[in-house]
Structure formats: C-alpha cells, structure tokens
Amino acid sequence: MELNLKGKVAIVTGGGGVLGGSIARSLVENGVKVAIMDIRQDKLDARVNELKSFGEVIGIPCNVLDKASLEAARERLLAEWGSIDILVNTAGGNLPGATLREDQTVFDMKIEDFNRVTDLNMNGTVYPCLVFGKAMADQGSGSIVNISSMAALSAITRVPGYSVAKSGVSIFTQWLAMEMALKFNEKIRVNALAPGFFIGDQNRAVLINPDGTYTERSRK
C-alpha cells in the first residue's frame, strides 16, 4: 500500500533522540513538513541541520511537561503551516535511580527518580496529546502515534518506573482513540507502538561494553 503524505504537517516530540530522529527523517523524506521538538537546544539544532537538506523541517524548543510551552508551539505551527496532521510522541527516557542493578531490589529504588521517569514518559505523552489533539479535533482529522514499550506488556526488565509509565501510555492511547472517534471524528486516529530494545544515548553504557561487546544486562 502506497501512502501519500506529501504536504502533511507533523510534530515529533523528543526529535533530538535516536528514535524520534529516525522517525522525523522518514517523514521529511516522504514530503511531510516536520516540526521537531526537544528540550535540548543542542540536540534540536543538530537534528534540524541533519535533516534540512531532505525537505521542510523546523526546530521548536519545547518542554512536553509544560502546557504553556506546548500551546505556544501549537499556535506557532497553526500560524505558519495551517494545520497539525500528525503527532508522534517519542519524548521519554529513564534514570539510573529508577533502574535496578543486579545486586539491588525494588526497595533500593530512588522514589524521586521513579516519579521523574513516570512523569516524563506518561505525562510527557498525555500533555502533547491534549494540546495538539485539540487542533485535530477542531479540524476533524489527524493521526497521533504514541510510543509505548515491550516493557509495558511483561515484567521483563529491571525498569519499574519506565514499565509503569509505558503501561499508562498504552491504556491512555486506547482511551483517547475512543474519545476522539466517538466525540469528534472517526478520521482522528490514535495508536501506539511498542518497540523492543534498541541502542540509544541513554542506555548505550548499560548495554555495550567499551570494547563493543554486550554487557551482562544486554544478554538477559
């Protein structure tokens, strides 16, 4: 099946990261106007510079946990490009204090890091859905893609905070899909992807030894 996305407007939160950057590139290469959002200005600038030769792309500094920041981004995009057709929520991550080492139990987990991880991964998905989803509700069409995780489906890793947050993302996605279709328009779709492990900046040292071999954690 061939999809023609040329001229559509997409937002990719966390676009400075590995996953978000890959998705943003694919969209740009298919003729989509892409707004990359990230709280890290250096990562944002680097990604825009990487992709601008492939098509129309802009970078918008944005905090996915700050509603005012998200609303300002929405109004800018609507003023410049007229619509918001696609939202891909890839902003997220983990923290050492919310990850259990082999010699630790759940009682060693830092509750502060647990709270930060659940806030970023769950609310950092919910808030953009509410802000940019409003534009889709108003225009009667759009597609939201959230990033869940295989860790939300089974307790397969030592990442309790991340797993809890991604479980929340999964059920919120299902709920929002019904809400949008029943109360606004069936042309508004909300789905989630559940990737497995892949190497990124946040987990490279945990999964790969300095000599390039796999760590004990990555072999489990």
Regions found by a protein language model. Give the residues of each.
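A glycine/serine/threonine-rich, flexible loop-to-helix segment
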Residues: 102, 183-184, 197-220
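Catalytic Tyr-X3-Lys loop
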Residues: 93, 107-127, 141, 145, ...
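Active-site Tyr-X3-Lys motif and surrounding loop/helix of classical short-chain dehydrogenase/reductase
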Residues: 72-79, 98-108, 112-119
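Active-site helix of classical SDR
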Residues: 129, 165, 173
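Amphipathic alpha-helical dimer-interface segment in Rossmann-like NAD(P)H-dependent oxidoreductases
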Residues: 75, 116-138, 177-182
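Conserved glycine-rich Rossmann-like NAD(P)H-binding loop of the short-chain dehydrogenase/reductase
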Residues: 32-47
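Canonical Rossmann dinucleotide-binding motif of NAD(H)/NADP(H)-dependent dehydrogenases/reductases
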Residues: 3-35
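Residue(s) in the substrate-gating loop at a strand-loop-helix junction
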Residues: 149
